[in-house]
């Protein structure tokens, strides 16, 4: 009886080891499979001295919307307005006789023409309104943000990704466009 139990135990152990090895192989295969993503090269904007590379933002699809995962460094710490802008450009343009960083990106992407700034989940707001981007004390940003109304990568291609100085209250009151500051960093979504 002891010999039968011992043989059964070895058989179960061997079967379990094979099953775990197969499951681990499938897991590794899933991890290495190519997930479709867009990689946006982001530059800190300086129309006088020239732009400086500060990293990338990866955009991927999820069941809950598009996920924007930053891999950024060298930025001012704190919360920053984070938006998709209309045009695929980060070039400076002149406004009122002054060169403005990133003005070539145009305004917030608003294909439904709501003309309202709002929360990323609000149906009556710019589609380009994203959750605020958090930058750590060391200037790095790695926390992903979710855009629940955006579902497919093709929706955002041909626009730009903008980071503004200062936070974003997701409203047009008391200040327009969420009260965010100047355009700080930008990348074209290709």
Curated annotation (Swiss-Prot):
Residues 1-23 form the signal peptide. It is found in: Periplasm. GO terms for molecular function: copper ion binding; superoxide dismutase activity. The keyword Membrane does not apply. Residues 162-181 are annotated as: Disordered. Disulfide bonds join 90-186. Cu cation binds at residues 83, 85, 108, 164. Zn(2+) binds at residues 108, 117, 126, 129. Keywords: Antioxidant, Copper, Disulfide bond, Metal-binding, Oxidoreductase, Periplasm, Signal, Zinc. Its EC number is 1.15.1.1. Its main location: periplasm. It catalyses: 2 superoxide + 2 H(+) = H2O2 + O2. The keyword Disulfide bond applies. It holds the Pfam family Sod_Cu. Binds 1 copper ion per subunit. Its cofactor is Cu cation; Zn(2+). SUPFAM superfamilies: Cu,Zn superoxide dismutase-like (SSF49329). One of its GO terms (cellular component) is periplasmic space. Belongs to the Cu-Zn superoxide dismutase family. Homodimer. Destroys radicals which are normally produced within the cells and which are toxic to biological systems. This is Superoxide dismutase [Cu-Zn]. It comes from Actinobacillus pleuropneumoniae.
């Amino acid at each position: 009886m002891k010999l039968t139990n011992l043989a059964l135990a070895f058989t179960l152990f061997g079967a379990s080891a094979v099953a775990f090895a197969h499951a681990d192989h499938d897991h590794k295969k899933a991890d290495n499979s190519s997930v479709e993503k867009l990689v946006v090269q982001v530059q800190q904007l300086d129309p006088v001295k020239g732009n400086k590379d500060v990293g990338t933002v990866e955009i991927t699809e999820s069941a809950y919307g598009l996920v924007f995962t930053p891999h950024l460094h060298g930025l001012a710490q704190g919360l920053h307005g984070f938006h998709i802008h209309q045009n695929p450009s980060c070039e400076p343009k002149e406004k009122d006789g002054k060169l403005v960083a990133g003005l070539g990106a145009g305004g917030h992407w608003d294909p439904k023409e709501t003309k309202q700034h709002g929360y990323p989940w609000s149906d009556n707001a710019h589609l380009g309104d994203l959750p605020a981007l958090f930058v750590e004390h060391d200037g790095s940003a790695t926390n992903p943000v979710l855009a629940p109304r955006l579902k497919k990568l093709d929706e955002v291609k041909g626009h730009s990704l903008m980071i503004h100085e200062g936070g974003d209250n997701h409203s047009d009151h008391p200040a327009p466009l969420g009260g965010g500051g100047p355009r700080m960093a930008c990348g074209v979504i290709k």
